[in-house]
From Swiss-Prot:
It is an enzyme of class 6 (ligase). ATP binds at K650. This is Leucine--tRNA ligase. It is found in: Cytoplasm. The gene is leuS. Pfam families: Anticodon_1, tRNA-synt_1, tRNA-synt_1g. Keywords: Aminoacyl-tRNA synthetase, ATP-binding, Cytoplasm, Ligase, Nucleotide-binding, Protein biosynthesis. A motif ('HIGH' region) lies at residues 51-61. GO terms for biological process: leucyl-tRNA aminoacylation. The keyword Nucleotide-binding applies. It comes from Methanococcus maripaludis (strain C7 / ATCC BAA-1331). InterPro entries: aa-tRNA-synth_I_CS, aa-tRNA-synth_Ia, Leu-tRNA-lgase_arc, Leu-tRNA-synth_Ia_arc/euk, M/V/L/I-tRNA-synth_anticd-bd, Methionyl/Leucyl_tRNA_Synth, Rossmann-like_a/b/a_fold, tRNAsynth_Ia_anticodon-bd. HAMAP family: Leu_tRNA_synth_A. NCBIfam families: leuS_arch, PRK12300.1. Its EC number is 6.1.1.4.
Amino acid sequence: MDQNGVNAGNGHKSIDLIQIMDKWQKKWTEAKIFEAEHDLRDKFFITAAFPYLNGVLHAGHLRTFTIPETIARYQRMKNKNVLWTFGFHVTGTPILGLANQIKERKEDIIWAYNNLHNIPMDELIKLDTPEAIVECFSKKATEAFKRMGFSLDWRRNFKTDDKVFSKFIEWQFYKLKEMGHITKGSHPVRYCPKCENPVEDHDLLHGEESTTVEYSLIKFTSEFDGKEIIMPMATLRPETLFGVTNAWVNPNEMYVMAEVYDEIQKLDSEDVDLKYNGIWIVGKECADKLKEQDRKIEILKEIKGSELLGLKIKNPVTKKEVPLFPADFVEMGIGTGCVMGVPAHAPYDYIALRDLGKIEEVGLIPLIEIEGYDKFPAKEIVEKLGVKDQNDDELLEQATSKIYKDEFHKGKLNENCGEYAGISVKDIKEKLTKDYLNSNIAEIMYEFSEQKVVCRCGEKCIIKTVKGQWFINYSDENWKKLAHECIDSMNFAPENIRQEFHNKVDWMKDKACARKKGLGTLLPFDENWIIESLSDSTIYMAYYTIARFINEGLTPEQLVPELFEYVFLGNGNVEEIAKNSNISKETIEEMRKEFLYYYPLDWRCSAKDLIPNHLTFMIFNHVALFKKEHWPRGIEINGYVTIEGKKLSKSKGPVLPVSEVAENFGADVARFYITTCAELPQDADVKFKEMEKARDNLIKLYELAVSVMEEESTQKEFSLIDKWLLHKTYSSIKGAETAYEEFQLRKIGLMFYELINDLRWYKRRGGENNNVLKEVVEIWTKLLSPVTPHLCEEIWEKLGYSGFISQEMYPEIKSELINEDLELGEEFIKSAMEDIRNIKGVAKINPEKMYLYTADDWKYDLLEFMNENSEKNVKAIIPLVMKEDKFKRHGKEVMKLINEIMKIGVKKAIAEVEILENAKTFIESEFDCEVIVNGEDVKGKKKFAIPYKPAIYME
């Protein structure tokens, strides 16, 4: 077993999956069957979020990419002209950081890339430049895609550091700025002090989902050491200021007394003026943070927290003085290190005061009325839960969470809140914050939503107000309306993620779009900045449509903005553009046709981590730049991947490189398993034993194909079991079609395993018609070919067909072979046999004779009545049944039977007697005894029979 946990071979006595994989990949490449260009067919355009090349492609990529790959192959079978291609993301700082770490021979990085990413040491030590890393991992990613048999149009491949791609991004940013969507100013951003850059989700080692949280700093005042001071309290709930009885400091930590100056940026300049803002007392960590957020801090002295105890500070709203008390629960890494005490509503505050014996001294001030609570909610819930003291963290968290939730949704401010009385808690924050800021009794401070936010370089990130920073103004309400309109018009798989996108749009704020370091496109109107990696990856799907023309040899100089303006928007004079770009008019017109043919994008596929950034940005940028008819049509979201329960990690493992999976199991096994092991948007846990099981079952289909070709075809009439297998197979055509259309690929796997079981049952029931088996294999080879194309190509060839199954049409349903009664009949036999086994087991007998009794006619009449009635609720259907005389006379027995029928499921009545008679020989052989259907009613057993549940007597 290697560092990634792989311990499985690909060999099998009857088939070599790797040899088959090699064979068909070579044939596909030579035939160029996946190259797509516009024609008269309906198009289908699908893409996935391209991978970032700071490592090999891993199991997480495999799931995200195999889903659209499977759908692309299916859509080709539906006679769609499918465009499915890939690019590589290399811009930003992670690759730069990795190159530096390799150059510095960081032990953990060297170990990870040698052992987890499988880079030989002699090759690894050469990856000390961004260019070397991009070259290495782009080759490995290309190889991985090809080894998995992805049906890509490789003519359209590109990297985001290509000079020609940069010209496309320059056009995008010129357009956004022209529309007023790009602005320059000061804004708080996630920032790496070491890299000297704003950082985005992809730049982070920890805290990828962290957001910037806005705290209100409430300016309490006092006198300390002979000076008037401000002691700011950070809070997310400014309304609680009306209920403050005390404040908390950590007696064991260090604070500072410092002069604070506000930095006010000069108009049209990055220079600042300083405005005195008083002497503040805050925690040391807070002082460091404030320095980065538009303030200059000059420290006068350091103070131990214990020195502040006994100090009284004035509430700026109520004007009441409150004491400072000690509290170890005050975290210095959040806020100012000084916390307001609101014991009537905060369980932590109440229990801390109770532990100190200070409740009577300071009292409780209620400020929020909540339905279902008394005057002092914190006291009530602490006593109800039995919280012992401040160390009872679990119960305190539970209490806090419940109160805050109830206050937010059901609470309103009481008379202690003056002019704000009667306003609901959920509506007050914005108004209060605005009023406090205008009155100069509060300021704003920014914190991360998570404490551990670490750049890939290893440095702890901060929130920094960057001056002269370029932003995309995603906060624009009119722009958000268009984004919402787009989301409403789109398809989502699964559907329930639609609301999450609406929520992300509502929460969207302005975003830094450029940085000083890293790989990428220079900001065309300010070349001191480089466009960051989540801003150059929002509309590249449009670039795919014309990339094959560009990759034929067009130069960056030829890709003038007017070219993109015409190709994507239809603006401009094509003759002038041809003259200015030195690109033929015919080529430009072909580029325009190709874009118009393939756009809009039908489906965008990604893992769920890209919902709050890339995917939402994609929607914003499309609605800004493109006509409505070219807005994206659909987004598919899959969950994460774990390996034997362990979370994937590029630095610690496991990684499970895609190429390693292909070589150990074969591409088809990996494709089948990763697409069918979990439904959207659930996470998938890769289990190698289950992969081996999938491999074995796929090989059974191959072996069946070989056997049906080796045996002579029979010409006998179809038996009932033949008809049953054909019914099941042709029913699968529609089921698989629905599964593919709705991205429910796990159902394909379940249907395949059902096929394996059906084939076992068919053989067990005496099925041996080779013509039937060949027809079943042909259909299922087509149904599975989007998932397991190599194996299906091989089977197709074994069946005697020429050409590629990859170019075959989806199988058509033969409606004359669909007969639900056959399926119900076989399920009836299986159920009856299971009941027989259970009775044998309980009675511990081996019968010589067995009686099977079917239900009385009136019971079938009741089944039909229930089947035809739309009402499926027991209580509702009983009155309807009892109106019928033929049922009413059976009294209580009817009530019992209705419940029994509901348990087994309301189905149509079938010819049970005929079915049992036809299966009698089979049942006799299974149980080695004589079977009698509806013979003498021995010991009155027949009355116990109900539809689909024959009564059984053995002797």
